[in-house]
Amino acid sequence: MNELTPQEIVRELDKYIVGQERAKRCVAIALRNRYRRAKLPKELQDEITPKNILMVGPTGVGKTEIARRLAKLVNAPFVKVEATKFTEVGYVGRDVDSMVRDLVENAISLVKSEYMEKMKERAKALVEDRILEILIPEPHARKAGFKNPFEALFGAPSQEPEQTYQTTDDYIRTQREILREKLRSGELEDKVIEVEVEDTVKPPFEMIMGTISDEMGISFQDVFGSLFPKKKKKKKMTIREAREVLEQEEYNKLIDMDEVIKEAIHRAEQHGIIFIDEIDKIAGRGSGVGPDVSREGVQRDILPIVEGSTVMTKYGPVKTDHILFIAAGAFHVAKVSDLIPELQGRFPVVVELHPLTEEDFKKILTQPKNAITKQYIELMKTEGVNITFTDDAIEAIAKVAVKINEQSENIGARRLHTVVEKIMEDISFEYANVEKPIDVVIDKDYVYSKVSDMIKDKDLNRFII
């Protein structure tokens, strides 16, 4: 876990998110407290639980992005779920335990990728040996009338007597070393070979069992593993394609999945972050019928997971006591007080995110590392087109986005994507594979010429069904 101070965490978040200082401070403190807790004696660690956060603010102000960037910053298991997707036990829909199962899957993927990175060089060497064995089999694996592989590959006649070739291991090694150099130089990438691979098509019964096992948290593959033996089949493919397939097989052999699962469950329990979006949509007692049915029930189902319980997954039991939960909602109609009191108590840190202003929009267009204007500049560079956004163009885009948000639904910073896409549409369509580099300057006049139809007829949408 990265030993970042709260100030360092906020500075990292500032690279991607404009404004919302209090929200960034709160998540930074929550993250640092995990590091502080890890330094305490074991018995005291168990007593300290994370202070879950409830973010309140309209759509498009950065709630989800703050949580997502936070998880990436420390390489922590992270999952985003929609509260509206869950239903009370007994109704059709996803049960709330699935968010923990999803977190474990994410943690396993994270840990496995780290193990793969550590074993990358070893796996590449093993794959290289396997490809050479296919190109030049061992003598006992050869069929009668086998030809010198150099003759098969390059049309060169054999320089050794057949008898000597079939019985001399030194000669085989020499040939393989010569081919190894050609493999590494990329000369043989398009050569077609026959590879024995695992059949990835599962029988229908196994597919059904897989779906059920995910929902029940039971691994039927472990229970009935002998009923589903892995099938092999021979497949022709280029060496380039074979390398990817064989690398995956070698990783599966090299990586101890028991160790991966053990580490993944530990990370999910100690460092996992679950982001529950649209929590305001399940607030309120409702009428108990129609669409309101099970709203309070979902809250009561979420409650034990947030306050700490054990969820059974197909990889084993997972404790949720130290998972950090970040909930978010616009709360336009419902209020935070409409959540059941017990659930409110499990989110002691309530942060209000303010709506974005025109000045914020201008910063969003230019300051973040992943600003949409920067993305388009880099995209069009690949076509030989150098895009420049003038300062008055940035100001115009921000004004237009604010205007449209006022006239219709306010979707926050997401409106900037709509406006910029409209501005860039013709350029993206017309300029492809230009013969020589060209410069395109986007100014205020160009912006207004492209978006004029978006800001006129402001009341027209009320007549559209």
From Swiss-Prot:
Any single Gene Ontology cellular-component annotation: HslUV protease complex
Name this protein carries in UniProt: ATP-dependent protease ATPase subunit HslU
NCBIfam families xref list: hslU, PRK05201.1
Keyword Chaperone among record annotations: yes
Gene that produces this protein: hslU
Coiled coil: none
GO molecular function terms attached to this record: ATP binding; ATP hydrolysis activity; peptidase activity; proteasome-activating activity
InterPro entries tied to this protein: AAA+_ATPase (IPR003593), ATP-dep_Clp_protease_ClpX (IPR050052), ATPase_AAA_core (IPR003959), ATPase_dyneun-rel_AAA (IPR011704), Clp_ATPase_C (IPR019489), HslU (IPR004491), P-loop_NTPase (IPR027417)
High-level lineage: Bacteria, Bacillati, Bacillota, Bacillota incertae sedis, Caldicellulosiruptorales
Stated role: ATPase subunit of a proteasome-like degradation complex; this subunit has chaperone activity. The binding of ATP and its subsequent hydrolysis by HslU are essential for unfolding of protein substrates subsequently hydrolyzed by HslV. HslU recognizes the N-terminal part of its protein substrates and unfolds these before they are guided to HslV for hydrolysis.
Domain of life where this protein originates: Bacteria
